[in-house]
Regions:
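Short, basic, glycine/proline-bearing loop/turn elements
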Residues: 27-32, 105-106, 135-136, 155
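Conserved N-terminal subdomain of the carbohydrate kinase-like
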Residues: 24-26, 49-129
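Short, acidic Gly/Pro/Ser/Thr-rich loop/turn segments
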Residues: 11-13, 98-101, 139
Length: 171
């Protein structure tokens, strides 16, 4: 069994824990902070790897990006599509009572050339896979129909596909 994941809009997820409730406009000290590679597809590949299921994460970003070096550190196999841009950061602020405030950056802007390269990489790396999972939000420049169009292309080539995202159009 081999599962390929595509995370079109990966992130470096930073979680900051506060000792007092978040106060708008104030300077506050954190009592804890962690950062992890993120994005739904990345998270799926991490869970599969921990479970012993072969997986390959396809991630747009530079090979030296902290998200990709973090994936290397936890032995998640990946292939990257160079974008010339850093992978976005998402920030979660956790109040003492557990209330969370999330700030999600938009991600790398995709033009037609970058989209074509991503499509080609997904099709190329999916050869021999049992499943291809398209997961997470779409970055700027990829239309809401992107996943449904990629699913159609993958299914036409005989691949089993799954999509994990809210609001996917035309599936």
């Amino acid at each position: 069994l081999m599962i390929i994941t595509l995370t079109a809009n990966p992130s470096l997820d930073r979680t900051i824990e506060l000792g007092a409730p978040l106060a708008h406009g104030a300077v506050q000290r954190a009592v804890g902070a962690v950062q992890d590679p993120g994005g739904k597809g990345v998270n799926i590949s991490r869970a599969l790897q921990v479970s012993g299921v072969p997986t390959l994460a396809i991630v747009p970003g530079e090979a030296t990006d902290p998200v990709l070096t973090a994936l290397q550190a936890v032995d998640v196999e990946f292939t990257n599509l160079p974008t010339g841009e850093p992978i976005r950061s998402n920030i979660t602020v956790v109040d003492p009572d557990g209330t969370t405030t999330k700030l999600n950056a938009p991600g790398t802007v995709f033009d037609a050339e970058l989209r074509q390269k991503l499509d080609e990489l997904v099709v190329e790396r999916s050869k021999g896979a049992d499943w291809v999972v398209l997961a997470g939000s779409l970055p700027p420049g990829l239309e809401p129909t992107y996943y449904s169009e990629l699913v159609a292309a993958l299914r036409a080539s005989g691949y089993e596909t799954a999509v994990v995202e809210d609001g996917v159009e035309a599936l």
